[in-house]
């Protein structure tokens, strides 16, 4: 197989993530930001620290601030800002404590004051004031993750049991104005669903929440059932919202990186939303169908897949997507890889996974069954065994995932066996050799005489 496929994949991943880092996006969003009174900063999500760091650098100072992000995502001190780390994807006591600090910060503000609210993916777990016991919230979050609910369904329910989600945080900031700068991690950029919309009017309804409970047969306490009857804010007049990054930019950056490496990019979708295994099989089948054309091609899909947990292994949706593509591209000069822009894929240290035409054989040689690994949701260990993990570390951003199928240029070999008694003498005189190769475009013709 072409040894540069992995190198190309790594370069594409790096360029894609670099294009959606929050620093420049926040600077652009604050270009015309001129607050009149006090400015306090609240940042929540996996990219919260980097967003806050960039904002303070632009503004020069803030009149107080709170950052709440995932464990090991704080990179240092920010002047005037308290930085907190907390649980994700399940909120914990540190999530609740950090959120309480933010609520105390915004109390007593005046109409001329501004709350600069920096929001990124992961905020639903990290920024939380539960209206139900923490144990019940933890159980609900676990049940939603296990049953395969998508992010919109998860956040629709989370809003019902939270004192800050679904626009309630913006209500608590009043009469101050809230300027919300958002890195979108949800397909289509629905502002009321990103981190469960703490500062945006909620479009979901109690009826929809009840349907989700019934769909997945989720256990509810009497308190939770009562909260399902309480509607969230449907209008907020003290909020301005700006989206600064999304999966569309991630895909565009991936396409540009592919083009720079000599691949012809094709954007399949930036709305990918299906089972991770299905997406991997689909990308692998595209690679098999298109291979052999003599062209370097790249098929790109952005979005966020889901995984139904059926086993007890270790992995994530991007690793599972990649592993599922391995059978389709076995033996081909092709690769499929998928990464999360935040550098985290499931409860692992990997951002995603990579497979190529050699992966399936390498797995089997090492005693692994790709099918069994998928059934046990153990893509992490399977890919680790064949150097198929993509590890970036925490990136400081979060705008969904990008998956790419790379197809290298392949020479098609046609061999002709010619009776030497008829043609050997003539061809020897004309071509001056007993075995010659003529290359035309990407096709190689071998003439073998016997």
Regions found by a protein language model. Give the residues of each.
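A glycine/threonine-rich phosphate-anchoring loop and its flanking beta-alpha core
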Residues: 151-213, 217
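A glycine- and small-aliphatic-rich helix-loop capping segment at beta-alpha/alpha-beta transitions
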Residues: 54-64, 80-82, 103, 107, ...
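Glycine-rich oxoanion-binding loops at beta->alpha junctions
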Residues: 69-112, 152-153, 157-158
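Accessory alpha-helical/coil subdomains and C-terminal extensions
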Residues: 176-179, 201-282, 286
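Glycine/threonine-rich beta-strand-loop-alpha-helix active-site module
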Residues: 67, 71, 75, 79-82, ...
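Internal helix-turn-beta structural module
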Residues: 323-410
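Gly/Ser/Thr-rich active-site loops/lids in small-molecule metabolic enzymes
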Residues: 130-151, 202-217, 311-337
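An N-terminal, well-structured beta->alpha segment
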Residues: 1-42, 50-51
């Amino acid at each position: 197989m072409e040894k540069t496929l992995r190198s190309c994949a790594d370069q594409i991943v790096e360029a894609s993530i670099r294009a959606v880092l929050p620093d420049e996006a926040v600077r652009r969003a604050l270009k015309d930001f001129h607050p009149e009174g006090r400015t306090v900063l609240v940042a929540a999500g996996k990219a919260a620290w980097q967003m806050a760091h960039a904002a303070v650098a632009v503004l020069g100072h803030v009149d107080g601030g709170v950052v709440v992000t995932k464990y090991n995502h704080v990179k240092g001190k920010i002047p005037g800002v308290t930085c907190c780390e907390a649980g994700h994807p399940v909120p914990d006591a540190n999530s609740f404590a950090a959120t309480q600090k933010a609520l105390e910060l915004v109390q007593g503000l005046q109409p001329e004051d501004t709350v600069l609210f920096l929001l990124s993916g992961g905020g639903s777990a990290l920024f939380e004031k539960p209206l139900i016991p923490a144990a019940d919230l933890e159980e609900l979050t676990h049940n939603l993750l296990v049953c395969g609910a998508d992010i919109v369904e998860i956040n629709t329910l989370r809003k019902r049991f939270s004192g800050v989600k679904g626009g309630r945080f913006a209500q608590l900031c009043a009469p101050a104005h809230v300027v919300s700068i958002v890195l979108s991690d949800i397909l289509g950029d629905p502002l009321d669903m990103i981190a469960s919309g703490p500062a945006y009017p909620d479009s979901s309804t109690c009826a929809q929440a009840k349907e989700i409970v019934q769909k997945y047969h989720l256990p509810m306490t009497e308190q939770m059932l009562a909260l399902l009857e309480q509607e969230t804010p449907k209008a907020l007049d003290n909020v301005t919202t700006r989206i600064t990054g999304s999966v569309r930019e991630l895909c565009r950056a991936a396409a540009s990186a592919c083009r720079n490496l000599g691949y012809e990019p094709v954007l399949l979708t930036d709305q990918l939303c299906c089972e991770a295994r299905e997406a991997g099989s689909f990308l692998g089948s595209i690679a098999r169908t298109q291979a052999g054309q003599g062209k370097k091609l790249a098929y790109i899909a952005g979005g966020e897949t889901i995984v139904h947990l059926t086993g007890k292994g270790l992995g994530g949706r991007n690793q599972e997507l990649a592993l599922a593509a391995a059978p389709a591209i076995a033996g081909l000069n092709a690769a499929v890889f998928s990464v999360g822009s935040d550098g985290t894929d499931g409860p692992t240290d990997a951002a995603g996974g990579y497979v190529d035409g050699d992966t399936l054989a390498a797995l089997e040689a090492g005693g692994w069954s790709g099918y069994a690994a998928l059934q046990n949701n153990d893509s992490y260990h399977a890919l680790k065994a064949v150097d198929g993990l993509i590890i970036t570390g925490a990136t400081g951003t979060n705008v969904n995932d990008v998956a790419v199928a790379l197809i290298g240029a392949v020479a098609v070999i046609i061999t002709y066996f010619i009776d030497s008694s008829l043609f050997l003498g003539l061809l020897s005189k004309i071509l001056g050799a007993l075995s010659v190769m003529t290359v035309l475009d990407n096709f190689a013709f071998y003439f073998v005489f016997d």
